[in-house]
Amino acid sequence: MAIPTAATLHHTGFLVRDLEGAARRLSDARGIGPWNVWTIAPTYCMVRGKPSPFTFRAALATVGTGTFELIAPHTGRSVYDDYLEEHGEGFHHTCLMYPTLDAVREAKAEVRRQGLEIIQEGSADDVFDFAYVVFPEIASLVELLYLDPSKLPPPEAVIGLASSPSAV
């Protein structure tokens, strides 16, 4: 099985230290937004193969037919902290989104069968399940994601251009 079977390209993720500030600057300077902001608290957390509870802040904005995601570490230790220390702010990953929980779990199993490294993964019941996979061929991270937007709470904040939330 090919890893992207049934997946669609969902978003491009960028790591930042100040999520609200970055969203505001992108809205003001580049017209990107509005940004829907959440604190994400996975109930299952693995970092480099070991349990490691973490939370993070995420902001999403529609850009044309795609989405930009800003991520900032919040609590606990995660690959977000490591990346910021080693590389600073900037591009982090490209996301492939799967239509069902079973589909993303099969993709994660396929990644493991292929011997690829999952450096971080997390999930919360049937709301979301994600994994960051190292694709050595392009020296980059690819996120495998299932997300049920109907089960997300409303955004904690909306930053920029308009007061109505954009698509997730």
What residue ranges belong to the model's regions?
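Long, hydrophobic N-terminal alpha-helical segment
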Residues: 1-52
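Extended intrinsically disordered, low-complexity coil regions enriched in Ser, Thr, Gly, Ala
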Residues: 20-39, 85-89, 100-124
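Surface-exposed flexible segments
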Residues: 23-29, 81-87, 154-164
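Short acidic/polar alpha-helix capping motifs at helix-coil junctions
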Residues: 20-25, 70-74, 95
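Vicinal oxygen chelate
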Residues: 2-3, 9-17, 59-64, 69, 83-102, 108-168
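Conserved short beta-strand elements that form part of the metal-binding/catalytic scaffold
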Residues: 33-83, 128-151
